[in-house]
């Protein structure tokens, strides 16, 4: 597992990276994570999140545009454990998570807005691998995202930690 330090990436690639507005907190068991972006756009329905974490996620980060909803949790312990088991590097969720005491012990990165105990409805509604924009940044499938306790940033190309 590669360790990323976002301030060092910003210093090394100032013209390449875009930094998200500082509204995310780290809820996962990894302090830092990064990888190729897979996007989901959904609202209070995590059907596609469930579907994607069951697939191989090696080298990938699931970016979920949940519309910023603070009324339902798009990720909980069971889906986080599936994501870890299937090799996902992490998830960036523009929305809420739950089961935070378990998430922090799960070997996957999780950045989200807040915690909320209510689960979502599963209606099968959402879009996969579409361009999404939140926190002042646009996420394109196939580009790259990096996160740590300092923040979250996006790059059109893979980044290497400076020596």
Swiss-Prot record:
MF terms in GO: 4-hydroxy-4-methyl-2-oxoglutarate aldolase activity; metal ion binding; oxaloacetate decarboxylase activity; ribonuclease inhibitor activity
GO annotation, biological process: regulation of RNA metabolic process
Keyword terms, alphabetized: Lyase, Metal-binding
Enzyme class, UniProt record, top EC level: lyase
4Fe-4S recorded as keyword: no
Domain of life: Bacteria
Reactions it catalyzes: 4-hydroxy-4-methyl-2-oxoglutarate = 2 pyruvate; oxaloacetate + H(+) = pyruvate + CO2
Family matches, as SUPFAM superfamilies: RraA-like (SSF89562)
Cofactor: a divalent metal cation
Matches recorded under Gene3D superfamilies: Ribonuclease E inhibitor RraA/RraA-like
Presence of the UniProt keyword Repressor in the record: no
EC code(s) of this entry: 4.1.3.17, 4.1.1.112
UniProt remark on cofactor binding: Divalent metal cation.
Pfam family, one: RraA-like
Binding locations of a divalent metal cation: 99
Binding, substrate: 76-79, 98
InterPro entries: RraA, RraA/RraA-like, RraA/RraA-like_sf
Family: Belongs to the class II aldolase/RraA-like family.
Quaternary structure annotation from Swiss-Prot or TrEMBL: Homotrimer.
Main function: Catalyzes the aldol cleavage of 4-hydroxy-4-methyl-2-oxoglutarate (HMG) into 2 molecules of pyruvate. Also contains a secondary oxaloacetate (OAA) decarboxylase activity due to the common pyruvate enolate transition state formed following C-C bond cleavage in the retro-aldol and decarboxylation reactions.
Name of the protein this chain belongs to: Putative 4-hydroxy-4-methyl-2-oxoglutarate aldolase
């Amino acid at each position: 597992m590669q360790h990323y330090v976002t301030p060092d990436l910003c210093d090394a690639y100032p013209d390449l990276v875009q930094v998200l507005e500082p509204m995310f907190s780290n809820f996962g068991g990894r302090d830092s994570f990064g990888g190729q972006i897979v996007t989901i756009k959904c609202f209070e329905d995590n059907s596609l999140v469930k579907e994607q974490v069951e697939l191989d996620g090696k080298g990938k980060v699931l970016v979920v545009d949940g519309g910023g909803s603070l009324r339902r949790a798009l990720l909980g312990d069971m889906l986080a454990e599936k994501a870890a088991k299937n090799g996902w590097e992490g998830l960036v969720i523009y929305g809420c998570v739950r089961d935070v005491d378990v998430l922090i012990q799960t070997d996957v990165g999780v950045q989200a807005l807040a915690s909320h105990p209510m689960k979502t409805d599963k209606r099968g509604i959402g879009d996969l691998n579409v361009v999404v924009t939140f926190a002042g940044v646009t996420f394109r499938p196939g580009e790259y995202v990096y996160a740590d306790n300092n923040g979250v940033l996006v790059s059109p190309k893979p980044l290497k930690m400076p020596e």
